[in-house]
């Protein structure tokens, strides 16, 4: 993080940044001097604009930071994780089913995440049903895979919103920040590819509820706006203001560090990068009310001094000090040279420390150089003492100094990294600790016949089956050949039995048993 001291550098570089709440005011532009009568003396109205003759006051509305607005704007969101739950079943030969669940991840789409979040927030039973594992299917001797693509919604997941560039800061984001949330892109990537972060409210601008409408008086000269009197009665000049967006709302950062949004035709430059604004809290409001009361009191003291001058017809350096303008801007300076009352137009600037205007003994710095004195007299009651030191009759009230210190300390840091360790994701595959399944459609895939063997076992089984088939073929072929040999042998044996010749004892050849029988009978 940026060191807190560095955040104040822009305010310390420019003395005018402390604007309406200095410890003292002194002209940075002065002259020329001209003699006047005591009837030309007047008290400055520090609550009404006197810049460049802008005296036309009219009521108007403007927007400022809410009272009680804190530096870290919390934005509620949720994380959406894509999960694929796979149920794998195998049914063996005897019908025994084995089920194995596996879990993988995928990157979800923002639209699907928003729909799932709405389901969860509305209490839709479909979200509760989606938390179950997929119901597995099974087939005999086959491996069946049933998958569910689920969306896991975890809420709340709080991020810090930077009002300057509308970036988000949390440890769940890569590098701790996300600057891509806009109308066209309503999600942030996280430290895991399968998880995205989305704001609970799809309209990001509604989450930046830090503004309030106020009423005041606009000070203008023609079409040019010089400044305005705020709702608490304190005048704020637009001189030196710059344009600055907070939460996408265009406004003006004034020289005192406050931020307002108001319509003006003035040409205004953009603020430099890294420019900060002051917070608006109850304490600053209370002090500003006290400042207004103090300025009113100072004006009453000035009027009393002016009345004393008119009554006694005499002027002193102490009384002239009451006529000094107490806030930066255009006004008058008064002095007495050679018993003559003198007046000069002046533009006052704020002073933070006395060393700024009294850098050394006897030197009153005005406009960057030591201002000459006339017989030990400067202006506005400032004189040179007998010892050669510059004597200033009074200084601003302690309330103004207190308010100035408050404005210096109340700035919005540029970065607001979330320090809540409960939302830090773990490395590796440990993200499954927070995964709860959200169920979309079911997809089934049925494999071929599977005996449940590993790859090497399948090859052994195929080899054994091929060998067995080969042996069976050889056996069948052998049997077939034996059958073919036995049939011709039996046929030949039957033919020989009918044609065989028998030789009797008499030596006569008998062709057959029948011939032998008939011959024997005849002989007999």
UniProtKB/Swiss-Prot annotation:
Name which cysteines form disulfide bonds: 43-302, 54-226, 80-113, 178-188, 208-247, 242-271, 363-370
InterPro entries on file: PH_Rhabdo_glycop, Rhabdo_glycop_CD, Rhabdo_glycop_FD
> What are the UniProt keywords, alphabetically?
Disulfide bond, Glycoprotein, Lipoprotein, Membrane, Palmitate, Signal, Transmembrane, Transmembrane helix, Viral envelope protein, Virion
Location(s) in or outside the cell: Virion membrane
Q: How does it sit in the membrane?
A: Single-pass type I membrane protein
Q: What name is this protein filed under?
A: Glycoprotein
Per its UniProt entry, which superkingdom is the organism in?
Viruses
Q: Which GO terms describe its biological process?
A: entry receptor-mediated virion attachment to host cell; fusion of virus membrane with host endosome membrane
Q: Which residues lie on this side of the membrane: Virion surface?
A: 20-459
Please give the sites of covalent lipid attachment annotated as S-palmitoyl cysteine.
479
Q: Which SUPFAM superfamilies does this one have? A: Viral glycoprotein ectodomain-like
Q: Where are the transmembrane segments?
A: 460-480
Any one of the GO CC terms: viral envelope
Usage in biotechnology: Primary surface antigen capable of inducing and reacting with virus-neutralizing antibodies. Almost all human and veterinary vaccines are based on the functional aspects of the G protein.
Attached carbohydrates are found at: 56, 266, 338
The UniProt family comment states:
Belongs to the lyssavirus glycoprotein family.
- Identify the stretch annotated as signal peptide in this record: 1-19
Post-translational modification note: Glycosylated and palmitoylated by host. Glycosylation is crucial for glycoprotein export at the cell surface.
Protein source organism: Rabies virus (strain Pasteur vaccins / PV) (RABV)
Q: What else is known?
A: Arg-352 is highly involved in rabies virus pathogenicity. Its mutation dramatically attenuates the virus.
Q: Which residues lie on this side of the membrane: Intravirion?
A: 481-524
Query: By which gene is this protein encoded?
Result: G
Task: Return any one Pfam family short name.
Answer: PH_Rhabdo_glycop
Keyword match Signal: yes
Q: What does this protein do?
A: Attaches the virus to host cellular receptor, inducing endocytosis of the virion by using different host proteins including TFRC, GRM2 and ITGB1. In the endosome, the acidic pH induces conformational changes in the glycoprotein trimer, which trigger fusion between virus and cell membrane. There is convincing in vitro evidence that the muscular form of the nicotinic acetylcholine receptor (nAChR), the neuronal cell adhesion molecule (NCAM), and the p75 neurotrophin receptor (p75NTR) bind glycoprotein and thereby facilitate rabies virus entry into cells.
The entry describes its oligomerization and partners as: Homotrimer. Interacts with matrix protein. Interacts with host TRFC. Interacts with host BST2; this interaction inhibits viral budding by tethering new virions to the cell surface. Interacts with host ITGB1. Interacts with host GRM2.
